[in-house]
Amino acid sequence: MSFTIRFATPADAALLAELGARTFRDAFAADNRPEDLAAHLASHYSPALQERELRDPQCSFLLAESAGVPAGFALLHDMPPEPGVPGRRPLRIERLYVDKPFHGTGVGAALMGRCLDEARARGHDVIWLGVWERNSRARDFYARWGFTEVGETTFVIGDDAQRDLVLARPLS
């Protein structure tokens, strides 16, 4: 399957809101209360919020497409790291999601590779992220890319505070 990866623009805000909400719901609906999931989606995946993030100079969205169909996305966020993240200039992968029809096609690997390339090109020495401790599929994916656990943090979905593992890997 062929696909392209490009930087998203503010014109992609509605598309990213819909894709983000769908992929988050697909990944976490079975393990969260419907009201918590609905609250999280409403507060994190509106077109207005996506547009605000797209215009933020500290954020960069990478959008993977196959024949013009959105297949997945990643959000790189240049922000202060969680405690325990090493390096002088770490960069966060805040989101990396692949739409269910594209699981197993290489889209996730291509997005990760592009995230690493972008981080290196911008002079970052470490890349880090948070992953839910119960998301074994994602944890296995990140382990294959050389990420190791460096800490933990709390991620709130609605009224449910969950434990996320903080993972990092050097870019050298």
Short names for language-model regions:
Residues A14, R139-D140:
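Alpha-helical segments flanking ligand/cofactor-binding loops in enzyme cores
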